[in-house]
């Protein structure tokens, strides 16, 4: 493990290994309130559901290092308002923005460079920094390999100085700032720096622990004030990859089980689309390029494009149809004319990202689960009388009395199940 990076470079230089060929077979799912109410139950269901799909991930020989697991939740304002006060600032009622960031644990100069970069770019974009918070963790639950590669896990708390911004405008400014930070970090060669999430709406907790240990490692998740309207969870199984903290999912917009067989073509086509990208919504389109970072896995690349579509104004259901379309034909006798015209338009806009896939995704207005056009990855769901949707790779991930179940089933090829949160 100590020589991991050195040996990995030897393999890459010899063209024996490439990150671009990485694929996963995982467990994925969504818990959501069908009436759009934040609750502790959604968070606890999400944690329990993640624990239930532990068998969809691999375990290292040390018995504690996993391939990666994580959960994506809304930002609980009461919880983080207290953390802001600890920094010596008063929360003035403005939107609380939170960045979940991995830093190189044993390189203090790189840590300082990364923090300076984050603060500098956010300040340039008219954000004010409340401060940094070291996320409380329990490394005792980690295996030896996970602990050796464990990053310094921190959160940056901040706000925008213009309170008149709409939620979407604020998210766009945060997104553009994050992209600038990422580009500068690559330029400055800051290794071990990774932004899990940077948002005014949600936060992602993930890592190389066992799924059952997520709340034991991230102590924040045990706080009763941690409430949410949705929980997207993911258990990674690396079929031909080396696990790492940054490759654990969920990513910023979605969690993905499957593989994109058209990945190389999709990546090349995105480079073409970048030449035509233009929008008055962003300060400078060059800040957003490249949309797909070099060396990204297929899941990470899909997430990058999905996120860009969301942040540009496309809803999560529409973004799914653009990237992972239904199987359809102009000769269909059952498909309505309106649907044919929609699919024809989307087909002319974006090439399909094809391959076996089940996803759980959110744009902070919609929370969805969906299947690929052939239905090659399972996605099952249960809707309970207490207005909770439980969807994922397995049925029975959360214990619900049969008498409390309104409906249950599975998604067919190309189908989407969504909740407007």
Go through each PLM region and give its residues.
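Conserved short alpha-helical segments that host acidic/polar catalytic motifs at enzyme active sites
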Residues: 2-421
């Amino acid at each position: 493990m100590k020589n991991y990076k050195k040996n990995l470079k030897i393999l890459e230089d010899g063209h024996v290994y490439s990150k671009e060929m990485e694929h996963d077979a995982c467990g994925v799912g969504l818990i959501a309130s069908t009436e759009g109410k934040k609750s502790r139950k959604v968070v606890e269901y999400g944690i329990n559901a993640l624990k239930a799909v532990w068998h969809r991930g691999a375990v290292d020989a040390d018995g504690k290092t996993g391939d990666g697991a994580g959960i994506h939740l809304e930002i609980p304002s009461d919880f983080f308002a207290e953390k802001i006060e600890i920094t010596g600032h008063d929360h003035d009622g403005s939107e609380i923005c939170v960045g979940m960031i991995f830093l190189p644990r044993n390189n203090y100069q790189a840590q300082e460079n990364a923090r300076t970069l984050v603060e500098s770019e956010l300040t340039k974009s008219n954000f004010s920094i409340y401060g940094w918070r070291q996320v409380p963790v329990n490394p005792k639950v980690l295996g030896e390999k996970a602990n050796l590669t464990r990053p310094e896990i921190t959160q940056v708390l901040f706000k925008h100085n213009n309170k008149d911004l709409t939620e979407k405008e604020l998210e766009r400014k945060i997104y553009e700032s994050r992209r600038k930070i990422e580009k500068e970090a690559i330029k400055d060669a800051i290794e071990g720096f990774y932004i899990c999430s940077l948002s005014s709406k949600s936060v992602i907790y993930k890592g190389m622990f066992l799924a059952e240990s997520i709340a034991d490692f991230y102590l924040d998740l045990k706080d009763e004030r941690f409430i949410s309207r949705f929980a997207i969870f993911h258990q990674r199984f690396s079929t031909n990859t080396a696990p790492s903290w940054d490759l654990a999912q969920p990513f910023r917009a979605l969690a993905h089980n499957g593989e994109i067989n058209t990945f190389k073509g999709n990546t090349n086509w995105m480079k073409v689309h970048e030449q035509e990208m233009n929008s008055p919504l962003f300060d400078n389109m060059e800040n957003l390029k490249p949309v797909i970072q070099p060396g990204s896995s297929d899941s990470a690349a899909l997430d990058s494009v999905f996120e860009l579509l969301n942040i540009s104004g496309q809803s999560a259901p529409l973004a799914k149809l653009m990237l992972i379309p239904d199987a359809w034909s102009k000769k269909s006798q059952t498909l309505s004319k309106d649907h044919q015209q929609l699919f024809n338009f989307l087909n002319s806009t974006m090439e399909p990202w094809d391959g076996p896939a089940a996803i759980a995704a959110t744009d902070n207005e919609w929370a969805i689960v969906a299947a690929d056009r052939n239905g090659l990855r399972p996605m099952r769901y249960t809707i309970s009388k207490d207005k909770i949707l439980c969807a994922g790779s397995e049925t029975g991930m959360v214990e619900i009395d049969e008498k409390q179940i309104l409906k249950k089933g599975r998604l067919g090829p190309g189908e989407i199940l969504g909740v407007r949160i």
